Amino acid sequence: MAMVPEITCDEVDFYRDDDDRQFYEADGPNQKKGYFQYPDLCSKESLLEEDGIQLKFTTQPHQFHQTVMVIVAIEKMKHLNGLSSQFFQDNDLMNIFTNIFQEEPITFKNCDIYESDSSFRLVSSQDCTIQDINQKCLALSKASELRALHLNGRNISQQVIFSMKYLLGDIGSQKTHVVLCIKKNNLYLSCVRRGEKPILQLEQIANFPSINVEKRFIFNKVEINNTTEFESAEYPNWYISTSQMDEQPVFLGNIRGGKDITDFILADF
């Protein structure tokens, strides 16, 4: 229930300004003195029933700006449609606040999204050993060359342990991307072109990057039944391969299901 201080039917001094918002400023508005007559408030028995508002007069002191706020609210309510024919509801109060107070605009900034030169980045790793389907192990020769050979219990320690690092690649790609590193020596398998065809080589890198991984180090890990193939991401249809013969270098070949072996068996270490 809105309450205003007692006033008379005579002319009442008041302060006004063209902008209603100045009534709520902390330092007060640029005040102009004037006069107004408010006949609807002259009688204490007067009820604004057509607006659904009941006014009760009291002699309790009120601050001037509180009185002005009530008068401003009443004036704005009298110009709202639909209040006189129905009970005062929550939506009506919300409409009053919307008319009295001005909402501040919401500001926002546009942000640009940039794509990295390379979309490959490391996410996890797995230590494992790798053998071809003829049970030849991969081992380093004295010349730091990766070879495939049969090892028995006495020299099985020559078998290298790989750190197979998994990468996130292109969005929507169904392929599994990995990097193969000989863990003990930080030797990374990579594919580069020499002459007319790509070859497989080892590169020693102390601090391998976790983002923007160059494509020559990346292999597509393809699982078929219980075996795995490693296809070069840089040179599609070229695979890590071993020879049918023993103690031959591991190489990059483009023949699957032929004399060269492209199927491997992985074992967690």
From Swiss-Prot:
<dbReference type="GO" id="GO:0010573">
    <property type="term" value="P:vascular endothelial growth factor production"/>
</dbReference>
<dbReference type="GO" id="GO:2000556">
    <property type="term" value="P:positive regulation of T-helper 1 cell cytokine production"/>
</dbReference>
<keyword id="KW-0395">Inflammatory response</keyword>
<dbReference type="InterPro" id="IPR020877">
    <property type="entry name" value="IL-1_CS"/>
</dbReference>
<keyword id="KW-0963">Cytoplasm</keyword>
<dbReference type="GO" id="GO:0005149">
    <property type="term" value="F:interleukin-1 receptor binding"/>
</dbReference>
<dbReference type="GO" id="GO:0005178">
    <property type="term" value="F:integrin binding"/>
</dbReference>
<dbReference type="GO" id="GO:0051781">
    <property type="term" value="P:positive regulation of cell division"/>
</dbReference>
<dbReference type="GO" id="GO:0019221">
    <property type="term" value="P:cytokine-mediated signaling pathway"/>
</dbReference>
<dbReference type="GO" id="GO:0001660">
    <property type="term" value="P:fever generation"/>
</dbReference>
<dbReference type="Pfam" id="PF02394">
    <property type="entry name" value="IL1_propep"/>
</dbReference>
<dbReference type="GO" id="GO:0071222">
    <property type="term" value="P:cellular response to lipopolysaccharide"/>
</dbReference>
<feature type="propeptide">
    <location>
        <begin position="1"/>
        <end position="112"/>
    </location>
</feature>
<dbReference type="InterPro" id="IPR000975">
    <property type="entry name" value="IL-1_fam"/>
</dbReference>
<dbReference type="GO" id="GO:0006955">
    <property type="term" value="P:immune response"/>
</dbReference>
<dbReference type="GO" id="GO:0032729">
    <property type="term" value="P:positive regulation of type II interferon production"/>
</dbReference>
<dbReference type="GO" id="GO:0005615">
    <property type="term" value="C:extracellular space"/>
</dbReference>
<dbReference type="GO" id="GO:0005829">
    <property type="term" value="C:cytosol"/>
</dbReference>
<dbReference type="GO" id="GO:0033092">
    <property type="term" value="P:positive regulation of immature T cell proliferation in thymus"/>
</dbReference>
<dbReference type="InterPro" id="IPR008996">
    <property type="entry name" value="IL1/FGF"/>
</dbReference>
<dbReference type="GO" id="GO:0005764">
    <property type="term" value="C:lysosome"/>
</dbReference>
<feature type="site" description="Important for interaction with integrin">
    <location>
        <position position="183"/>
    </location>
</feature>
<dbReference type="Pfam" id="PF00340">
    <property type="entry name" value="IL1"/>
</dbReference>
<keyword id="KW-0666">Pyrogen</keyword>
<keyword id="KW-0202">Cytokine</keyword>
<comment type="subunit">
    <text>Monomer. In its precursor form, weakly interacts with full-length MEFV; the mature cytokine does not interact at all. Interacts with integrins ITGAV:ITGBV and ITGA5:ITGB1; integrin-binding is required for IL1B signaling. Interacts with cargo receptor TMED10; the interaction is direct and is required for the secretion of IL1B mature form. Interacts with HSP90AB1; the interaction facilitates cargo translocation into the ERGIC. Interacts with HSP90B1; the interaction facilitates cargo translocation into the ERGIC.</text>
</comment>
<keyword id="KW-0497">Mitogen</keyword>
<feature type="site" description="Important for interaction with integrin">
    <location>
        <position position="175"/>
    </location>
</feature>
<keyword id="KW-0964">Secreted</keyword>
<comment type="similarity">
    <text>Belongs to the IL-1 family.</text>
</comment>
<protein>
    <recommendedName>
        <fullName>Interleukin-1 beta</fullName>
    </recommendedName>
</protein>
<dbReference type="InterPro" id="IPR003502">
    <property type="entry name" value="IL-1_propep"/>
</dbReference>
<dbReference type="GO" id="GO:0005125">
    <property type="term" value="F:cytokine activity"/>
</dbReference>
<comment type="function">
    <text>Potent pro-inflammatory cytokine. Initially discovered as the major endogenous pyrogen, induces prostaglandin synthesis, neutrophil influx and activation, T-cell activation and cytokine production, B-cell activation and antibody production, and fibroblast proliferation and collagen production. Promotes Th17 differentiation of T-cells. Synergizes with IL12/interleukin-12 to induce IFNG synthesis from T-helper 1 (Th1) cells. Plays a role in angiogenesis by inducing VEGF production synergistically with TNF and IL6.</text>
</comment>
<keyword id="KW-0458">Lysosome</keyword>
